[in-house]
Amino acid sequence: MNHIFKHIPVMKKELIDSLKIKKNGIYIDSTFGTGGHSNEILKKLGQSGRLYSIDRDPIAFSIGSKIKDSRFHIINENFSKLLDFAKNEKIIGKVNGIIFDLGVSSIQIDDYRRGFSFKNDGPLDMRMNPNYGISASEWLFESNVKEISFVLKNFGEERFSRKIAYAIKRRSQIKKITSTLELANIIKKTIPTKNKFKHPARRSFQAIRIYINQELEEIHKALESTLKILKPGGRISIISFHSLEDRLVKKFMIKNSTKAIIPYGMPITEEQLNRLTTCKLKIINRILPTQNEINNNPRARSSVLRIAEIQE
């Protein structure tokens, strides 16, 4: 697949600086993408430092495989498998920093053939790894109104979820929806457009993409695994791009940085007992993009960088 990807990493300096990189440290880039963050980390590592990168997208893996550096290793896997990977590499409790740059990557959104864009026509796929799972086209064809409406409402916060779901199923009864613009136009004709700068299909496309790739479940598993992988003083830095992601990250950090409050006389769970005595995380910072960065890179507009550290 010959395609040139023009990717500007969001808050790159802030993300890299947040790690406080040690020259001989061990780091994990959980979302390699086109390698912008990984390459910056490698520049700061000494000869005995190590960087492990992960990406489920086969094209991202192909890009990463071209990096010939003995300090670098990349695997083609979901980041929810971080713990298994760390066990295999024998780096549990030894990692100095882990980064996540969540959401869809430029590899996916900029290539119409991947089926993520509601602006350019392509096959309605949306799988981050096209070799696994069901495509968006197949899922919409096989699902009923209730199932589609649930996904649009819960993963896209779409007010008109049921109306859109009915329109999709009406078209599906005539023929399967197979292209991105076909779906985008169905949605555009179904709901009112108040903001000319925001496409009416954006929430629905986000919702379907999140569901098809099980993104929120993947994030939850990956975040929990970082608590075992990082060493004391190790940092986790996460960039999210929409409220569902950021809510999940914020909840994870708050839950693991505050002690449990147990009402007197109530039974206590093992998790609550652990939280009574220890707080695993210390929240370091929350950073938003500057207006200058937003002007130069509109994709930065909704981004949030959250940083936390494993307690010493």
UniProtKB/Swiss-Prot annotation:
Question: What is the annotated localization of this protein?
Answer: Cytoplasm
SUPFAM superfamilies registered for this protein in UniProt: Putative methyltransferase TM0872, insert domain, S-adenosyl-L-methionine-dependent methyltransferases
Indicate where this protein is primarily found.
cytoplasm
Question: Which positions are annotated as binding S-adenosyl-L-methionine?
Answer: 35-37, 55, 85, 101, 108
* Entry GO CC: cytoplasm
Molecular function as annotated in GO: rRNA (cytosine-N4-)-methyltransferase activity
Which Pfam families does this one have? Methyltransf_5
In the record, biological process GO terms are: rRNA base methylation
Q: Which transformation does this protein catalyse, written as a reaction?
A: cytidine(1402) in 16S rRNA + S-adenosyl-L-methionine = N(4)-methylcytidine(1402) in 16S rRNA + S-adenosyl-L-homocysteine + H(+)
Q: Which UniProt keywords apply?
A: Cytoplasm, Methyltransferase, rRNA processing, S-adenosyl-L-methionine, Transferase
Function of the protein: Specifically methylates the N4 position of cytidine in position 1402 (C1402) of 16S rRNA.
- What protein name is recorded for this chain? Ribosomal RNA small subunit methyltransferase H
Q: Identify the species of origin.
A: Buchnera aphidicola subsp. Acyrthosiphon pisum (strain Tuc7)
